[in-house]
Amino acid sequence: MAHKKGVGSTRNGRDSDGQRLGCKKFGGEHVKAGNIIYRQHGTKIHPGNNVGLGRDYTLFALIEGVVKFERMGRDRKKVSVYPAN
């Protein structure tokens, strides 16, 4: 057996925690004003009707209603909140 550890093993052994990005409310779900809909880095998804954009690009509902994901042209997506009937 080796009397020294393998060089790699002493330098490895760290891993940062995930940042919990992604979708928090899905299409068709009911939201209240202020609810976070999507956490992201940059505008992967753009804000649509009744959706606000936070400083860190978090999308949140401005009114109470139902979430709807939509397309903006061919390559962009947006999320909107429409009042529940």
Curated annotation (Swiss-Prot):
Residues 1-21 are annotated as: Disordered. InterPro entries: Ribosomal_bL27. Keywords: Ribonucleoprotein, Ribosomal protein. Coiled coil: none annotated. The keyword Cytoplasm does not apply. One of its GO terms (biological process) is translation. Belongs to the bacterial ribosomal protein bL27 family. NCBIfam families: L27 (TIGR00062). This is Large ribosomal subunit protein bL27.
